[in-house]
């Protein structure tokens, strides 16, 4: 009787384990939480899809992710905190938000350091740039590390009126990411900076708390900011760069082989996501035009650049040696 009960108990455990998706052998699948604060239809979703597909490929299906888009796990600063405590496995954040825990990450928020979109894509795929950024994060942040770099394209300004030159932002209240670089660049253009979580931007534009916001074209489209700020001016003042993070708790749970799989997936994202994200930006601009949004092209950038360029080296030096090194690497990429 005792033997029969034991056998029944073992069988029940196995059935329960299968029903719950619990591993009963070393080759079972493992799924990890992957959070980001933008809709699935943005470049964040593109990056997560590439990461998941490559991870499944190299691991033979043993490792994969569950995506939590649209700030389901919190806005980026909140997710970063949860990541560092091991409550989330993977997160995508902007490099600007990364600078809240690693100030030298603000180097990627410097204005007009990328000559064009091709230069941007080459930079993010460059192993030296990626390694320099990862070393900087490793030295500055406890509880998490960066696996790779991605982009959402270039940031542009949007408002209820045209921004055709630097004169048009003078005296305006501009919602910016809370970084030293933004708080230095925009006042140099004559604007007043305002900090707030991304989720508050729509209402703040609607009520006039801010007059201007800035972000990628697809982000502007996906979050329907055009409803309250129907003029998109293509200032392309800053790259909308981002990074893929992993919790140290999760990373340390991987075998050496699994770490290689995860890093390979991140490298695939850095190599292929930028061009897809840039293509998405162009598609989004066309969709916005059809929705009646006024897209101001041919912005006179000369005044912006004249104010921004002297600040680049000054800010990089103030941020620290890692920032100076990364800026030098960016400038040297042909």
Regions found by a protein language model. Name each.
Residues 1-12:
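Bacterial N-terminal signal peptides that target proteins for export
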Residues 2, 25-26, 98:
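Coiled-coil-like amphipathic alpha-helices with heptad-repeat character
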Residues 13-20:
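Residue-level signal for alpha-helical transmembrane segments in multi-pass membrane proteins
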Residues 20-28:
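Sec/Tat signal peptide C-region and signal peptidase I cleavage site
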Residues 29-120, 128, 135-334:
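N-terminal secretory/targeting leader peptides
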């Amino acid at each position: 009787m005792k033997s029969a009960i034991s056998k029944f108990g073992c069988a029940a455990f196995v059935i329960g384990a299968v029903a719950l998706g619990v591993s009963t052998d070393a080759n079972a699948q493992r799924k990890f939480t992957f959070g980001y604060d933008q809709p699935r239809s943005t470049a964040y979703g593109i990056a997560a899809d590439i990461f998941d597909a490559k991870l499944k490929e190299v691991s033979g299906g043993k490792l994969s992710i569950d995506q939590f888009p649209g700030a389901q796990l919190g806005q980026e600063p909140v997710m970063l905190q949860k990541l560092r405590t091991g409550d989330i496995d993977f997160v995508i954040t902007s490099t600007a938000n990364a600078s809240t825990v690693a100030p030298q990450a603000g180097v990627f928020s410097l204005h007009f350091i990328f000559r064009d979109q091709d230069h941007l894509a080459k930079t993010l795929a460059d192993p030296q740039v990626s390694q320099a950024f990862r070393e900087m994060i490793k030295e500055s942040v406890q509880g998490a590390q960066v696996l790779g770099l991605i982009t959402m394209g270039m940031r542009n300004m949007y408002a209820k009126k045209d921004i055709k030159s630097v004169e048009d932002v003078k005296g305006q209240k501009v919602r910016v990411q809370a970084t030293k670089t933004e708080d230095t660049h925009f006042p140099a253009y004559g604007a007043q900076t305002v900090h707030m979580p991304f989720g508050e931007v729509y209402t703040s534009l609607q009520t006039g708390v801010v007059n201007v916001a800035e972000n990628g074209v697809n982000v502007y489209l996906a979050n329907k900011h055009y409803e309250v700020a129907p003029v998109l001016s293509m200032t392309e003042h800053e790259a909308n760069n981002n990074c893929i993070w992993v919790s140290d708790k999760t990373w340390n749970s991987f075998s050496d082989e699994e770490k290689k799989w995860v890093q390979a997936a991140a490298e695939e994202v850095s190599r292929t996501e930028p061009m897809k994200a840039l293509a998405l930006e162009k598609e989004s601009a066309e969709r916005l035009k059809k929705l009646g949004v006024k897209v101001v092209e041919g912005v006179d950038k000369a005044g912006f650049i004249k104010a921004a360029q002297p600040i680049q080296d000054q800010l990089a030096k103030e941020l620290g040696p890692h920032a100076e090194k990364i800026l030098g690497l960016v400038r040297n990429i042909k």
